[in-house]
């Protein structure tokens, strides 16, 4: 199947490449079908591209390496929604934003994916410990996807 994108043109994907976010994203609840596309230029950057809206794509990176203590707590309802049997198989991404003064990531709204089930969910963290606009120091801080780390 093909999807049209404004960033990459027409992209050939397999149906199995689709990732469902049944609840959508904050501000974009009606969009639930996406595909993860690795950036062809910058390693560690991926795009969460809507399968139905060509103009809707979000840059995703793993939480910055500088935040070794970054934790996402999954409650039982989160695990059920993601059909997650083993939290170690989950991946965490954060949304990249361009702001005055450089790039930032949203640490309060991470995305958690269950790759085997092709399911994702945006979490909304209630702790004020992490910023909505956490500044990145540069492209060297863009690692690949992060394995899930649970907290009690």
PLM regions and their residue ranges:
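A short glycine-leucine-enriched loop at secondary-structure breakpoints
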Residues: 82-85
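Short beta-strand-centered segments at strand-helix junctions
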Residues: 70-77
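Long, compositionally biased stretches
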Residues: 1-68, 87-152
